[in-house]
């Protein structure tokens, strides 16, 4: 090993140049990472032997065109340490982290070569030599060494944007080529148009940025403060740090900074900080981590209480326009830029945006994102397309951020393009499982059937001793869990929850494990799903299907036969053979004593001739329901919440047209299964925390902020109820008492509003929190985790590994420490939020599709009963039970007319005024006639669709009568208060809609079979979204 010195010229965060001297060690045994080399260690990522060449980007190409190199189709990429360090020092933490992630990702065929530690690859910097010239010379010398090290078996191509470098080095060494990046893409990847298009888009953006910096010095915004000044200000309490959240309904006017912790000094700021207008936002974009300076109290403002475009119930606490802490953004702590879907303006608008028609202001799909300026030659060709762009910069002299074109998704209005838009907007990128991942999968064919292995003999075998069965949605193929219950010789009960043993098939750090970790969850849309695991696992070998042997991880309790108090618990690996695969409907019929399924369900036909076996099954379902009820009552006594969510499924006709939107109906057996899953999750949480108190993965649900309950309290007060929100127990008791015998929907709406006020539940590592912070507010449990759905949640896979290590049935050397586990939890939480938002937006898409082809003036399906649940200064918020839709209706239109009601209840627009009161809004006409719209009033509405060229279509509601719709049938959940409690349990309902809208917007349907091939569940699936209450991921009501 040779010791030398390396002189670095660095810049501080304030821009000051610093000369630093570092010790530098050179070695002979630096790993090359090529599969062609048989002398270096072969651990870690290796470049394939099958490649035709290796490609090495120089520093400038890596910095400016890293996005192009991220395409997995580009293979054989060698990132030199010299170029990697240039990114770190010159492009900042964000791009460097992306580069490190790319190098770690086994799905991308790229490696890091530590050329500056290799004795013969490294060249010291010469006196007077510029940093860029030295970096280029060092990288080229490393390319030559690498080519010779691989015994000249494969050519090496160095790509650069510097023509002088090409002229100097291109002919210097045979089989080591130096070419421009564009020539490389055109020559070596002629059929990969996407990479070349992205390269040209980035190139044009860099040229435009250089021109703009020369042309204009005028400031549109103040400069951001340097990072070290911001950090000092946050520490002293002068500045506050938080995430910028833009109100999508008033994106130009209202945004809020949600504080991530108070400063070092005492402060009375305990709420969000209001940012009024775009100038004080100072180029911050929704999701950025920002530093904010509070304005003087005399300049504080309040958010408006009026309806505006796109008003829905996405927020809480908008009852009054009270003054709140107001500030301005002084700096960006961390950008949160992502891919954005945009649409080009109409042709006539494009031509008026400047002399250079290649520079276009495109409109983002997301209302919260400002217009983005891009340079492209495809503006006219992509007029009616949804396209993806990325933001590159936002200089202080520009009104809008600068970005570049990435790719087109398809025509706006086309179903597949709209679905792709939703995925991109939620940063979800799902490629088919790779050959490497599928190669890890076991086989289960007719010729080579899968069987229980002899080496698994230490598992507890339940196949002959236990009646095991599952209860799932009809047609479900991905069965995560099965149950058993029996009476022990001692007279006690034994209850078992058996969960698919996914970790047996998905070993740590395999290709499948890495892909599952990246996806973190299965993504559900209204008409399809994208799985976390390959189909052979999720729908076959990990699925606890009936009459086949399967591996499971089980939790088995021994409990008192009368009180159901738990005496002992056992955890471990098992082998099971499920006897019955029941649907929820069939299980509910059996629970109710209805034996019709014995004739209608083929699986149950043998029970007609076996009354003893039938009684055993009936007893098991009934006893399990009793145990679940007792367990639930104990949680209720501790303060468990019974809240409401809205779940709607798309009902298809024979030709796959959308025939109806149907709210999901709850069953008692839903709650039974959910409670058993909660019990298993709770006990597993206790076990893994006891074994690994510093790095167990648990799930917490923090108490909600009290100000979010304000609208709930006001609404309850309007009906004479008082809501106590001091604790979860007080809230639960208050909601139980808030029943209106004349209208059960009142209690349902109050519970839905309580749900809106809740905080988000999230995963965490126990070493990062104190024990009193572990509490799950919604479920009233001291410790909770997710164990029961490893097929569709990566968190459950981690918990399985922890549990098996804790009971000495699994390896311990791969368990994550607290820091790594906390980082993984942040990733999973982010992916879960994306999955929830994606599912919500896709359902809204199909709701709009359902109404879009209907005439709202003549089609009775567009006329519905609605309930007022919110009052605004110019309108009301409505809930439509028939379709599970929330929306807003104006009482004052753009012409200044107000909505007045005739004696027969019909409404019309007249001159007049509005007066907003806490529980009602009063309409007064010029003739001095007054009408009131009160909270919880039933009205009749007309449903229309508002189409948008740039944004998603949205539902618009018009009040046509201040009386209930006489033809509307009441929902069962509204007419039967006893069913309200089981609405806590939610299941995603999905269909196999195969629709593609034609170019001009007409529906063109495709066969469903193509997607059914990849689906796991035919029909409804419970455990996908049980902890989600529409937007908030609150309720972990099953262990799913």
From Swiss-Prot:
A single GO cellular-component term on record: cytoplasmic exosome (RNase complex)
Any GO molecular function: RNA binding
Pfam family, one: RNB
Cofactor: Mg(2+)
Gene Ontology biological-process entries: mRNA catabolic process; rRNA catabolic process
Residues of the CSD2 domain: 360-426
PROSITE patterns in the cross-refs: RIBONUCLEASE_II (PS01175)
Keyword set includes Lyase: no
Location (main, coarse): cytoplasm
Domain CSD1: 232-310
Alphabetical keyword list: Cytoplasm, Exonuclease, Exosome, Hydrolase, Magnesium, Nuclease, RNA-binding
Top EC class of this enzyme: hydrolase
Family of the protein in this entry: Belongs to the RNR ribonuclease family.
Function, as annotated: Catalytic component of the RNA exosome complex which has 3'->5' exoribonuclease activity and participates in a multitude of cellular RNA processing and degradation events.
The protein, known as: DIS3-like exonuclease 1
Source organism: Xenopus laevis (African clawed frog)
Gene: dis3l
């Amino acid at each position: 090993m040779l010791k030398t010195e390396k002189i670095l010229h660095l810049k501080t965060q304030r821009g000051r140049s610093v000369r630093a001297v570092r010790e530098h060690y050179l070695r002979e045994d630096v790993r090359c990472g090529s599969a062609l080399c048989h002398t270096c260690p072969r651990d870690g990522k290796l470049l394939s032997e099958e490649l035709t060449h290796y490609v090495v980007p120089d520093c400038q190409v890596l910095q400016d065109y890293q996005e192009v190199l991220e395409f997995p189709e580009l293979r054989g990429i060698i990132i030199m340490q010299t170029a990697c360090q240039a990114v770190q020092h010159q492009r900042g933490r964000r791009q460097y982290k992306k580069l490190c992630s790319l190098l770690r990702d086994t799905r991308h065929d790229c490696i890091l070569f530590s050329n500056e530690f290799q004795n013969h690859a490294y060249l010291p910097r010469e006196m007077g030599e510029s940093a860029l010239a030295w970096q280029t010379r060092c990288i080229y010398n490393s390319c030559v060494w690498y080519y010779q090290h691989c015994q000249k078996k494969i050519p090496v191509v160095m790509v650069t944007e510097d023509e002088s470098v090409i002229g100097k080095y291109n002919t210097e060494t045979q089989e080591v080529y130096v070419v421009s990046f564009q020539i490389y893409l055109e020559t070596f990847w002629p059929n990969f148009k996407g990479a070349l298009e992205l390269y040209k888009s980035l190139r044009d953006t860099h040229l435009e940025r250089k021109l703009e910096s020369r042309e204009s010095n005028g400031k549109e915004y103040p400069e951001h403060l340097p990072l070290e000044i911001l950090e000092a200000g946050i520490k002293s309490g002068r500045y506050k740090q938080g995430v910028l959240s833009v109100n999508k309904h008033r994106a130009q006017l209202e945004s809020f900074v949600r504080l991530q912790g108070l400063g070092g000094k005492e402060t009375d700021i305990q709420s969000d900080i209001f940012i009024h207008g775009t100038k004080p936002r100072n180029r911050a974009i929704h999701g950025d981590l920002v530093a904010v300076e509070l304005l003087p109290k005399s300049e504080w403002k309040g958010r408006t209480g009026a309806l505006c475009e796109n008003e829905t119930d996405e927020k809480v606490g908008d009852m009054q326009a009270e003054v709140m802490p107001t500030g301005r953004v002084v700096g960006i702590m961390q950008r949160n830029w992502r891919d954005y879907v945009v649409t080009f303006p109409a042709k006539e608008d494009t031509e008026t945006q400047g002399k250079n028609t290649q520079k276009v202001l495109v409109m983002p799909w997301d209302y919260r994102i400002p217009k983005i300026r891009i340079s492209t030659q495809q503006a006219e060709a992509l007029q009616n397309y949804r396209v993806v762009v990325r933001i590159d910069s936002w200089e202080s002299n520009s009104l809008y951020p600068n970005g570049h074109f990435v790719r087109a998704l398809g025509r706006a209005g086309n179903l597949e393009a709209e679905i792709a838009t939703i995925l991109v907007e939620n940063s979800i990128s799902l490629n088919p499982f790779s050959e490497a991942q599928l190669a890890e999968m076991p086989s289960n064919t007719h010729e080579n059937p899968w069987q229980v292995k002899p080496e698994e003999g230490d598992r507890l075998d339940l196949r002959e001793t236990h009646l095991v069965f599952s209860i799932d949605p009809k047609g479900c193929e991905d069965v995560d869990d099965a149950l058993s219950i029996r009476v022990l010789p001692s007279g006690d009960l034994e209850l078992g929850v058996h969960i698919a043993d996914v970790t047996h098939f998905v070993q740590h750090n395999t290709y499948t494990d890495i892909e599952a970790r990246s996806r973190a969850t299965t993504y559900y849309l209204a008409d399809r799903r994208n799985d976390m695991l390959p189909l052979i696992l999720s729908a076959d070998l990990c699925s606890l299907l009936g009459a086949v042997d399967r591996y499971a991880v089980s939790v088995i309790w021994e409990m008192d036969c009368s009180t159901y108090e738990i005496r002992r618990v056992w955890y471990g690996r098992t082998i099971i053979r499920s006897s019955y695969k029941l649907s929820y409907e069939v299980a509910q019929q059996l629970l109710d004593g209805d034996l019709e399924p014995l004739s209608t369900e083929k699986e149950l036909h043998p029970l007609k001739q076996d009354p003893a076996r039938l009684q055993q099954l009936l007893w098991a379902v009934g006893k399990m329901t009793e145990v679940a009820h007792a367990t639930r009552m104990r949680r209720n006594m501790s303060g468990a919440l019974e809240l409401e969510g809205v779940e709607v499924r798309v009902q298809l006709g024979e030709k796959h047209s959308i025939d109806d939107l149907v709210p999901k109906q709850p069953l008692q057996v839903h709650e039974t299964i959910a409670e058993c899953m909660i019990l298993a999750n709770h006990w597993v949480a206790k076990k893994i925390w006891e074994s690994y108190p510093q790095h167990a993965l648990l799930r917490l649900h923090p108490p909600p902020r009290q100000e979010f309950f304000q609208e709930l309290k006001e609404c309850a007060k309007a009906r004479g109820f008082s809501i106590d929100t001091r604790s979860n127990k007080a809230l639960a008791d208050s909601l139980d008492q808030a029943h209106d015998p004349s209208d059960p929907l009142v209690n349902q709406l109050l519970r839905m509003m309580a749900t809106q006020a809740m905080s988000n539940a999230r995963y965490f590592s126990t070493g990062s929190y104190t024990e009193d912070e572990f509490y799950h507010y919604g479920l009233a449990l001291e410790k909770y985790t997710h164990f029961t759905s490893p097929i569709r949640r990566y968190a459950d896979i981690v918990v399985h590994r922890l549990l098996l290590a804790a009971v000495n049935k699994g390896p311990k050397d791969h368990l994550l420490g607290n820091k790594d586990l906390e980082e993984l939890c942040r990733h999973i939480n982010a992916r879960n939020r994306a999955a929830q938002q994606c599912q919500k937006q896709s359902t809204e898409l199909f709701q709009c599709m359902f109404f879009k082809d209907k005439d709202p003036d003549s089609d009775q399906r567009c006329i519905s009963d609605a309930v007022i649940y919110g009052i605004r200064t110019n309108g009301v918020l409505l809930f439509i039970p028939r379709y599970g839709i929330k929306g807003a209706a104006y009482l004052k239109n753009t012409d200044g007319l107000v909505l007045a009601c005739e004696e027969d209840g019909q409404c019309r627009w007249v001159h007049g005024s509005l007066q907003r009161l806490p529980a009602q809004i009063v309409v007064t006409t010029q003739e001095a006639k007054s009408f009131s719209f009160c909270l919880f009033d039933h009205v009749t509405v007309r449903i229309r669709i508002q189409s948008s060229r740039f944004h998603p279509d949205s539902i618009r509601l018009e009040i046509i009568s201040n009386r209930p719709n006489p033809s509307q049938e009441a929902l069962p959940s509204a007419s039967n208060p006893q069913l309200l409690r089981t609405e806590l349990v939610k299941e995603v309902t999905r269909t196999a809609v195969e629709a593609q809208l034609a170019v001009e917007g007409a529906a063109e349907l495709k066969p469903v079979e193509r997607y059914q091939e990849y689906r796991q569940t035919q029909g409804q699936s419970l455990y996908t979204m049980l902890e989600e209450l529409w937007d908030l991921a609150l309720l972990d009501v099953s262990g799913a």
